[in-house]
């Protein structure tokens, strides 16, 4: 488990963009980030799992002649092969879905762009007001900082008393600006929600959505057909491992039974 935790921690701490900074690659897609995370996680599980199996074989497996470590390596090889075979198929599936839903994203973006243009002046005005408030607060606090440096500890209590009402005033004025912005953007939020609802309702009965559903089902069917050979290879690869474990276990039970009968 330590290897798994370490792998996940390293992935999140370094970030998905870290390697692109050094390699100068293009930004990753969502699928690339998911695939990289899954690869790191599976490799970590495989390594930590092998360590655990080795410990188990040392304590128990040798007595029962289970050959756990050999079977684990066989399983790891089988799953690695499955992952490499399904990788291109899965990538193709998501690429096709992304291409087929491009029209849907474009329809949604039309409304978003229109609303963004309308609310931009309010956001800009809000930002300017906040900056003015901060500048006003800074000018009021600056002389107090000078007094503190001159009077040192003696004026610390006095400075705190002066800063408290200034901070409260800044907080109240900021809340006022936020409430004002919320009131200004409220109608646009409602409008956007209504238009999005109307757009989705229209899409339910549209030929485009029906066509997309048909394509999605077709992609799923294609994915299933292409993945079937890889899954069959996995099943065939697991059979010898399971048979080996079964034979070893039965042999061990038979040996133990003979020893007990001889006593």
Curated annotation (Swiss-Prot):
Spans of repeat Sequence: 66-87, 88-109, 110-120, 121-142, 143-164, 165-186, 187-206, 207-228, 229-239, 240-263
GO CC annotations on file: chylomicron; endocytic vesicle; extracellular vesicle; low-density lipoprotein particle; spherical high-density lipoprotein particle; very-low-density lipoprotein particle
UniProt KW keywords: Cholesterol metabolism, Glycoprotein, HDL, Lipid metabolism, Lipid transport, Lipoprotein, Oxidation, Palmitate, Phosphoprotein, Repeat, Secreted, Signal, Steroid metabolism, Sterol metabolism, Transport
Entry keyword Phosphoprotein: yes
Gene3D superfamilies associated with the record: 1.20.5.20, 6.10.140.380, Apolipoprotein
GO BP annotations, alphabetical order: adrenal gland development; amyloid-beta formation; blood vessel endothelial cell migration; cellular response to lipoprotein particle stimulus; cholesterol biosynthetic process; cholesterol efflux; cholesterol homeostasis; cholesterol import
Pfam families: Apolipoprotein (PF01442)
Keyword Glycoprotein among record annotations: yes
Self-association and partners: Homodimer. Interacts with APOA1BP and CLU. Component of a sperm activating protein complex (SPAP), consisting of APOA1, an immunoglobulin heavy chain, an immunoglobulin light chain and albumin. Interacts with NDRG1. Interacts with SCGB3A2. Interacts with NAXE and YJEFN3.
Family as reported in the entry's similarity comment: Belongs to the apolipoprotein A1/A4/E family.
Name of the protein described by the UniProt record: Apolipoprotein A-I
Highest classification ranks of the organism: Eukaryota, Metazoa, Chordata, Craniata, Vertebrata
């Amino acid at each position: 488990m330590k290897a798994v935790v370490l792998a996940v921690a390293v992935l999140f701490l370094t970030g998905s963009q870290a390697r692109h900074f050094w390699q100068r690659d293009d930004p990753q897609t969502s699928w690339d980030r998911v695939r990289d995370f899954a690869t790191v996680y599976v490799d970590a599980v495989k390594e930590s799992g092998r360590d655990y199996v080795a410990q188990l074989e040392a304590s128990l497996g040798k007595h029962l002649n289970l050959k756990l470590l050999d079977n684990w390596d066989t399983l790891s090889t089988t799953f690695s092969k499955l992952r490499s075979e399904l990788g291109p198929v899965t990538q193709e599936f998501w690429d096709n879905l992304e291409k087929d839903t491009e029209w849907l994203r474009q329809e949604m973006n039309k409304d978003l762009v229109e609303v963004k243009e309308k609310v931009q002046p309010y956001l800009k005005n809000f930002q300017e007001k906040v900056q003015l408030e901060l500048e006003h607060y800074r000018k009021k606090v600056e002389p107090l900082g000078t007094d503190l440096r001159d009077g040192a500890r003696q004026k610390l209590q006095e400075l705190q008393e002066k800063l408290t009402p200034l901070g409260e005033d800044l907080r109240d004025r900021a809340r006022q600006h936020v409430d004002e912005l919320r009131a200004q953007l409220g109608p646009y939020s409602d409008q956007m929600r209504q238009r999005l609802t109307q757009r989705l309702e229209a899409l339910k009965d549209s030929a485009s959505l029906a066509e997309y559903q048909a394509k999605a089902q077709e992609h799923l069917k294609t994915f299933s057909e292409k993945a079937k050979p890889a899954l069959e290879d996995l099943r065939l690869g697991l059979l010898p491992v399971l048979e080996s474990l079964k034979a070893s276990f039965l042999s061990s039970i038979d040996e133990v039974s003979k020893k007990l009968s001889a006593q």
